[in-house]
A protein has these predicted regions:
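Hydrophobic transmembrane alpha-helices of multi-pass, membrane-embedded glycosylation machinery
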Residues: 39-40, 87, 106-110
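Active-site beta-strand/loop microenvironment that shapes enzyme catalytic pockets
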Residues: 66-67, 94-95, 106-108
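Alpha-helical transmembrane segments and their membrane-interface boundaries
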Residues: 1-70, 74-83, 116-123
């Protein structure tokens, strides 16, 4: 095993461990969602990928979560709103050059979870 591989794995472990610990300590808020694990794979294992740029990670998650919440607020929880939310998220990430594939799960989570605008700030931001 190369030392950079170990550092990537350890960095991902440390980041997700801290987020999970904070989430465990703060029973009133969720600090971790599954797409963050996929983001850490990109950020730690493929840091030179354009999809792993900090701008893409942060804005991709915010944009995608916003698309999901807006779709849910307007259309409710149904197959059409899930499709619109994901399509809108992808479109907005592409035109803003903030594409981040793990963020594609956020609009689905937002619609299925019936999330309010708070979801955009906690846990996404």
């Amino acid at each position: 095993m190369k030392s950079k591989d170990f550092l990537a794995a350890f960095g991902a472990f440390l980041c997700i461990f801290i987020m999970a610990t904070v989430s465990d300590l703060d029973a009133n808020n969720i600090w971790i969602i599954p797409p963050f694990g996929a983001s850490l794979v990109l950020a730690m294992a493929l840091p030179s990928s354009p999809l792993a740029r900090p701008k893409n990670i942060v804005l991709g998650h915010l944009i995608a979560a916003s698309a999901g919440v807006i779709a849910y607020q307007i259309l409710g929880n149904n197959p059409l709103s899930i499709g619109i939310a994901l399509g809108l998220a992808i479109y907005l990430m592409l035109i803003t050059d903030t594409t981040h594939p793990p963020a594609g799960a956020n609009p689905i989570l937002a619609v299925l979870g019936g999330e309010s605008f708070d979801f955009i700030l906690m846990p996404v931001a």
